[in-house]
């Protein structure tokens, strides 16, 4: 299972986009991709 800290750190770059209508940061896309990859391989 993924820890809350792992999810938090991977989505940190998305907070402005999700809450303040800020431009989508490249780090957000990277974090989401990382989480997706971890979710597919983490029991």
UniProtKB/Swiss-Prot annotation:
It holds the Pfam family Tryp_alpha_amyl. Plant non-specific lipid-transfer proteins transfer phospholipids as well as galactolipids across membranes. May play a role in wax or cutin deposition in the cell walls of expanding epidermal cells and certain secretory tissues. This isoform inhibits the hyphal growth of several fungi in vitro. The keyword Transport applies. The keyword Transport applies. InterPro entries: Bifun_inhib/LTP/seed_sf (IPR036312), Bifunc_inhib/LTP/seed_store (IPR016140), Plant_nsLTP (IPR000528). One of its GO terms (molecular function) is lipid binding. This is Seed non-specific lipid transfer protein-like. Belongs to the plant LTP family. Homodimer. One of its GO terms (biological process) is killing of cells of another organism. It comes from Raphanus sativus. Keywords: Antimicrobial, Fungicide, Lipid-binding, Plant defense, Transport.
């Amino acid at each position: 299972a993924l820890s809350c800290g792992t999810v938090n750190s991977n989505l940190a770059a998305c907070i402005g986009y999700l809450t303040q209508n800020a431009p989508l940061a490249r780090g957000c896309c990277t974090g989401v991709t990382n989480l997706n990859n971890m979710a597919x391989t983490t029991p």
